[in-house]
Amino acid sequence: MSKKPHSIKVPTQYRATAKILKAALEQQKCIKTLIFAEKHARTRSLHTVLKKFSENRVALEKAIEETGLLRDNPSFDPSLAKILVTELLFGRKELNGESKPVQTVRSYKDRLLNSIRDFGVQRKEPNPRYVRINTNLYSLAEALDYLHKSDWRRKELPADASYADFLTAIKSLAENEFMTDLHVEGVLIFPAKWSNYWVRHPLVHSKRFILQNKATCLAAELLAPPSGATVLDMCAAPGMKTVHICNVMQNKGCIYSVEQDHVRYNTLCEITKDAGCDIVKPILGDALNLTPERFPDVEYILVDPSCSGSGMQNRMTVCDEPKEDKRLQKLQGLQIKILSHAMGAFPNVKRIAYCTCSLWKEENEQVVQRCLQLNPSFKLLSCKKALRNKWHNVGDKDYPNIGKNVLYCQPDSDLTDGIFLALFEKRREGEKD
């Protein structure tokens, strides 16, 4: 005799996901931290369903309310209901098992679909998948040859193509097409639908291909240390930008990569080793304690400090994230300290790139403004000019001589993560504005 629905347990995966969602909503805890703390479920599956909920939360909650799912079933755990509805409408489109909650949600399927349809859910098209060639292990020619033999077709633009032409071409990539980036050599662009394909690809696992958003590649591109230079990466973990700098330098010279957290330091060591970075010297320590005596020959510095992360497109949020002025003030203070230390502590430094994955001016233009006031021996270079003027988004014009020279990557218009970049150069003796 078959079991009654009340006696059939909800699958562990659904219960674990609902537990995480409940903690995130009620305690405003970080979803990713909660996922990695969950020991009894498949983390990839948890991540997928919660991301779908994050992307469609307004429509899902409206559908649940309009159909009376929770009102008609008062004993139904709201978090579990949200997870099951997410899976049914936006995930695998089916539910496992015959438990009472699963059967209940299935019985509401048509009503839920009608509500979603009436709501007119308009999903934002995901940005493309960026894949960077790690030239320590694999050349551009080898990568292009591999793609050609794998039946990928390269979409090419004329030499005089504008940035607008480039963005239009990305949006119209056919399923089997890819492009090379307009700004960063070795960055390949694929349609968004292939994101998971590359996550599992052997070339990625062997570190010959690196999954790195184009926006974060601009830091090494703008810093542009030559082969043989001495570079300091002050806040280096997990190490993707360090590897890219190593590629720019053709694996010749020296890169000091600094990280103060033990776990992140170990990740930095592992990534740079696996990526074939012969010139990287990982250092466990605080960037603010770095001295010119220990690093006398530093010429180029990357400053990529802790920030709010407000520009990151892969963040999962299940509650509104208001601008937290107190937190931004603390972050700004730390950012000013680190960037100012980079400017003042190393006598042979020529160029500094400052980068955040934030879209808040408190962490960007205001930090640049204060550090230039504290360190008049430095000047701003134009990031837009460094990209041959093939860029649209610059800083706030309310910051004279700063806004026009700094650069923003905006998710909607640049099809990347949200990133801010500023480029500083040491003045020659006697040089003035």
UniProtKB/Swiss-Prot annotation:
S-adenosyl-L-methionine binds at C235, A236, A237, P238, G239, M240, K241, E259, D286, D304. Gene3D superfamilies: Sun protein, domain 3, Vaccinia Virus protein VP39. InterPro entries: MeTrfase_RsmB-F_NOP2_cat, MeTrfase_RsmB-F_NOP2_dom, NSUN5_7_fdxn-like, NSUN5_RCM1_N, RCMT, SAM-dependent_MTases_sf. The keyword Methyltransferase applies. GO terms for biological process: defense response to Gram-negative bacterium; positive regulation of innate immune response; rRNA base methylation. It catalyses: a cytidine in 28S rRNA + S-adenosyl-L-methionine = a 5-methylcytidine in 28S rRNA + S-adenosyl-L-homocysteine + H(+). GO terms for molecular function: RNA binding; rRNA (cytosine-C5-)-methyltransferase activity. PROSITE patterns: SAM_MT_RSMB_NOP. The keyword Transferase applies. Disruption phenotype: Increased lifespan and stress resistance. Pfam families: Methyltr_RsmB-F, NSUN5_fdxn-like, NSUN5_N. The active site is at C357. Keywords: Methyltransferase, RNA-binding, rRNA processing, S-adenosyl-L-methionine, Transferase. S-adenosyl-L-methionine-dependent methyltransferase that specifically methylates the C(5) position of a cytosine in 28S rRNA. Belongs to the class I-like SAM-binding methyltransferase superfamily. RsmB/NOP family. This is 28S rRNA (cytosine-C(5))-methyltransferase.
